[in-house]
């Protein structure tokens, strides 16, 4: 729990003083508890909740000014390079990294639930073949509550925990199938002899005709890091959506489906896809210099550089760049678009205009390049983001349900018509 500092903020309102308690977390700025303002007949006004803490949480801490991202106290770069994704999942869910024995047990639990009910596979046939994979994901993830309804008592901790495992285990299967369905290929089932990232890539790219298909270990490691680097990011739009939906008592599958819907918005989950679209618009390496001049003149936007939260650098980007270099070296790809991206990076890291404004490449810039190099189409980028973020969403959902909570009910500043009568 947060602790009262003993300090109070004083609000002068209509000739009266309202004392508002100030609380401290373990890290980050103090917060002012404004709920007593309601008794005065007033609301606070904070569009976008930019200065509002909607909850207490022990899961993730971000200091955007210093470029810090911690999961349960551990720096993200350490988790991405010294732990794997499922260890990070265990950490987010339980608060501590697993012991060797706990890791074996947790990995086995996840493997045991990677299959989905056979009727779920038929559910895909209701979608058009040209449907966006995110549209499919919203539908099939929400529909899981119709197939696993025997464990939906959100007051039962055992039901909550098994649902968390099921979501982490089944989302990669559904994500890969959403791709297979849109390209008209048979579904590939998960294999218990593969790790989490290998399994996903196998379900994405293996076919019944290619029995010798093997996942490149460099690509599996890269995918695992992408999953880890996107596992959670505090109270962002989609996580807040999951919490808000969860506050109504909605089942967890519905809540995660709501999170996927929020993530689908281009302002949230579409950043790495936007990077590839920008590269398409630039066209060739020869056009990069002129494009960057247009950026300076504010004629076009530079996607994948800078970050809304991180004012200095994105702590995930260094690991992602290293991973990007490893993937491109391993594949030896001669892709004009990747060469174009590298030229963008070179200019941004050396041009004083971008350096002074701290417009460094962020995680979305490098992840987009990696996913393209692996062979994943751009419409699947946000699906992979949703796959990785599922553990963050369900961790916040579990945290909220572990104690007392209130249904979310934001207020508004009404600017419409005053009361009037119908006149006929």
Swiss-Prot record:
The active site is at residues 307, 364. It holds the Pfam family Citrate_synt. Its EC number is 2.3.3.16. GO terms for molecular function: citrate (Si)-synthase activity. It catalyses: oxaloacetate + acetyl-CoA + H2O = citrate + CoA + H(+). GO terms for biological process: tricarboxylic acid cycle. GO terms for cellular component: cytoplasm. Pathway: Carbohydrate metabolism; tricarboxylic acid cycle; isocitrate from oxaloacetate: step 1/2. Keywords: Allosteric enzyme, Transferase, Tricarboxylic acid cycle. PANTHER family: CITRATE SYNTHASE. Belongs to the citrate synthase family. Citrate synthase is found in nearly all cells capable of oxidative metabolism. Homohexamer. This is Citrate synthase. It comes from Acinetobacter calcoaceticus subsp. anitratus. The gene is gltA.
């Amino acid at each position: 729990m947060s602790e009262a500092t003993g300090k109070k903020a004083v609000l002068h309102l209509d000739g009266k003083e309202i004392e508002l308690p100030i609380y401290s977390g373990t890290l980050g700025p103090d917060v002012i508890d404004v709920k007593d303002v309601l008794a005065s007949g007033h609301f606070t006004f904070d569009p976008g909740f930019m200065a509002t803490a909607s909850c207490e949480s022990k899961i993730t801490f971000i200091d955007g000014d210093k470029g810090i991202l911690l999961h349960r106290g551990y720096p993200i770069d350490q988790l991405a390079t010294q732990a794997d994704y499922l260890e990070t999942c265990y950490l987010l869910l339980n608060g501590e990294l697993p012991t060797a024995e706990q890791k074996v047990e947790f990995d086995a639990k996840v493997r045991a639930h990677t299959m989905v009910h056979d009727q779920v596979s038929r559910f895909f046939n209701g979608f058009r073949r040209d449907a966006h994979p995110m549209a499919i994901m919203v539908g099939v993830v929400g529909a899981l509550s119709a197939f696993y309804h025997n464990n939906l008592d959100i007051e039962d901790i055992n039901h909550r925990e098994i649902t968390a495992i099921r979501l982490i285990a089944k989302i990669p299967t559904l994500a890969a199938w959403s791709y297979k369905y849109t390209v008209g290929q048979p579904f590939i089932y998960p294999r218990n002899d593969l790790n989490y990232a290998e399994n996903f890539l196998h379900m994405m790219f293996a076919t019944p005709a290619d029995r010798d298909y093997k996942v490149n270990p460099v690509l599996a490691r890269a995918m695992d890091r992408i999953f880890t680097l996107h596992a959670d990011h505090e109270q962002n739009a989609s996580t807040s959506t999951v919490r808000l939906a969860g506050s109504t008592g909605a089942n967890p599958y519905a809540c995660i489906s709501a999170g996927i819907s929020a993530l689908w918005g281009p302002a949230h989950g579409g950043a790495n896809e936007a990077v590839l679209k920008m590269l398409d618009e630039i066209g060739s390496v020869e056009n990069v210099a002129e494009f960057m001049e247009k950026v300076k003149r504010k004629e076009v936007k530079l996607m994948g550089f800078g970050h809304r939260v991180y004012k200095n650098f994105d702590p995930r980007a260094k690991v992602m760049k290293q991973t990007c270099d490893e993937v491109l070296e391993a594949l030896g790809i001669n892709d004009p678009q990747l060469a174009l991206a590298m030229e963008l990076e070179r200019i941004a890291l050396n041009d004083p205009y971008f350096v002074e404004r701290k417009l460094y490449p962020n995680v979305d810039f490098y992840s987009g390049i990696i996913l393209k190099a692996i062979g994943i189409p751009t419409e699947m980028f946000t699906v992979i983001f949703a796959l990785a973020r599922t553990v963050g969403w369900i961790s916040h959902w579990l945290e909220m349900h572990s104690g007392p909570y209130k249904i979310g009910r934001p207020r508004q500043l009404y600017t419409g018509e005053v009361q009037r009568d119908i006149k006929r």
